[in-house]
């Protein structure tokens, strides 16, 4: 039960998602509010990615934390090919956090996202239309902290930043 003034933390796993959504992060996490019987039905609707965004009008998380210590880059949402980006993504803007999360999945080699600029994805586009968060890279800032001093982390973040700049609608 959601109560007024309640703080909500959205804590999704980082994963690819076969079918319409292509990835499942905080915006898709809100779909958990829908009754399980109705969630199954939505998987057979061509506008699934767009419909899922409308459930996000029910609530606004105070914080989004995506566990990217591991992520699925193929298959999903229940199993798939694993990678270990070893990142945690946190923020108060679920669109911005999902754009970064999807960019990490893409950087890890996901064929589902390989040729698909994140900002042009239907799920992100609908979230922007609904005013759920950042409308483009100018509305977000990526701050990083590498606890290990890893060259792999630096290369990953460089790639993620590049991907977050692609495919921004005019």
Residue ranges and their predicted role:
Residues 1-170:
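Extended, low-polarity segments enriched in aliphatic/aromatic residues
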